[in-house]
UniProtKB/Swiss-Prot annotation:
Gene3D superfamilies: Glycogen Phosphorylase B. One of its GO terms (biological process) is lipid A biosynthetic process. Its EC number is 2.4.1.182. This is Lipid-A-disaccharide synthase. InterPro entries: Glyco_trans_19. Belongs to the LpxB family. It catalyses: 2-N,3-O-bis[(3R)-3-hydroxytetradecanoyl]-alpha-D-glucosaminyl 1-phosphate + UDP-2-N,3-O-bis[(3R)-3-hydroxytetradecanoyl]-alpha-D-glucosamine = lipid A disaccharide (E. coli) + UDP + H(+); a lipid X + a UDP-2-N,3-O-bis[(3R)-3-hydroxyacyl]-alpha-D-glucosamine = a lipid A disaccharide + UDP + H(+). Signal peptide: none annotated. GO terms for molecular function: lipid-A-disaccharide synthase activity; phospholipid binding. Pathway: Glycolipid biosynthesis; lipid IV(A) biosynthesis; lipid IV(A) from (3R)-3-hydroxytetradecanoyl-[acyl-carrier-protein] and UDP-N-acetyl-alpha-D-glucosamine: step 5/6. It comes from the Bacteria.
Length: 382
């Protein structure tokens, strides 16, 4: 730290998830250094914790190639301006929170100026575009990783990495209250319950909803009392799902939910979901699951060649085996999905073993991530 100056931390967050992480980190650092100064690109939560925003986070929150190209000049201007201002400020540590396409280059620029840099949240370099690890190694003094297999990957390339656990694992209880979740959703305690989560993106909902609904129809033949809950992320996805349901399964009774994905998982005996963060959340909710995923044929062909992992879902990557059934592309058919879900809806050995393994994995990644991240920042700042 610079003599006679309070701890000064520069941060850049590019989206809502990064704002949540940044706010938790700032809170943990303020508990140790009450006079610390925080500056950079911040969302409302980070600003509420006292971070001085040189730019609003929304400036960086662009998705899709067309949108990025339309904003490229502005994004490059912001990065160049931040490089200059942070170089003049000489913060004790710079923390780039996610947003790797923006932050890793910025981290490299600052590291060349002698500023300590941290990249918080590993990009999926272990899964695809693995050569990015070399740029990350040149650009950062430390990567903070949510998952243990991410640290193992960086260790192979001698890139400093600290496994800090996952903030979602900290936020969710080890033993969720299933009956309370059912009460809040109006689901009888003694009914069988299935959650359908066909994804958050329009393309996913379009590709998966029909087969997910047909799967529920098949399962209801075995379990006539089956309650089906379908949480959707926003009004647009709900409207899209309702249109597909009207064409495919107009008579299937379901509970459509606005948001409430976590409650639906906790309340359910089993879930059928697209992969992604939802699979991790479902594991932490202790809800046995099957992953079903389909994409356009060329995209799948390309993904098979680019992706370097044996599994697509985080529970399987954490377990190092096929704990959760993954039915991808041509295998993602209603009968196959139903066959995989049947033993999970039955109150038997398969379901209980999966539940117990989920609990063990939860404990592995429940490490108080905010405090661990603050430890890493303080160690670099010395």
């Amino acid at each position: 730290m610079v003599d006679n100056r309070p701890l000064t931390i520069a941060l850049v967050a590019g989206e809502t998830s990064g704002d949540i992480l940044g706010a938790g980190l700032i809170r943990a650092l303020k508990a140790r250094e009450p006079n610390a100064r925080f500056v950079g690109v911040a969302g409302p939560l980070m600003q509420a914790e006292g971070c001085e925003a040189w730019y609003e986070m929304e400036e960086l929150a662009v998705m899709g190639i067309v949108e990025v190209l339309g904003r490229l000049r502005r994004l490059l201007h912001i990065r160049a301006d931040l490089t200059g201002r942070f170089t003049d400020l000489k913060p004790d540590v710079f923390v780039g929170i996610d947003a790797p396409d923006f932050n890793i280059t910025l981290e490299g620029n600052l590291k060349k100026q002698g500023i300590k840099t941290i990249h918080y949240v590993s990009p999926s370099v272990w899964a695809w575009r693995q050569k990015r690890v070399f740029k990350i190694g040149r650009s950062t003094d430390m990567v903070l990783a949510f998952l243990p297999f991410e640290k193992a990957f960086y260790d192979r390339f001698n890139v400093p990495c600290r496994f800090i656990g996952h903030t979602m694992a900290d936020a969710m209880p080890l033993d969720p209250d299933k009956n309370a979740a059912r009460d809040s959703l109006g689901i009888p305690h003694d009914a069988h319950c299935l959650a359908l989560l066909p994804g958050s993106r329009g393309a996913e909902v379009e590709m998966l909803s029909a087969d997910f609904l047909r799967t529920a129809q098949i399962l209801r033949q075995t379990y006539p009392d089956l309650e089906v809950v379908v949480p959707l992320v926003n009004a647009k996805r709900r409207e899209q799902f309702e249109r597909i349901k009207a064409a495919v399964a107009p008579d299937l009774h379901i509970h459509l939910l606005d948001g409430k994905g976590r409650e639906a998982m906790v309340a359910s005996d089993a879930a059928l979901l697209a992969s992604g963060t939802a699979a991790l959340e479902c594991m932490l909710a202790k809800c046995p699951m099957v992953v079903g995923y389909r994409m356009k044929p060329f995209t799948f062909w390309l993904a098979k060649r680019l992706v370097k992992t044996d599994y697509v879902s985080l529970p399987n990557l954490l377990a190092g085996r096929e704990l959760v059934k993954e039915l991808l592309q041509d295998e993602c058919q209603p009968q196959a999905l139903a066959d995989a879900l049947l033993p999970l809806l039955a109150d038997g050995k398969t379901r209980h073993q999966m539940h117990d393994t989920f609990r063990e994995l939860h404990q592995q990644i429940r490490c108080n991530a905010d405090e661990q991240a603050a430890d890493a920042v303080m160690e670099l700042a010395q």
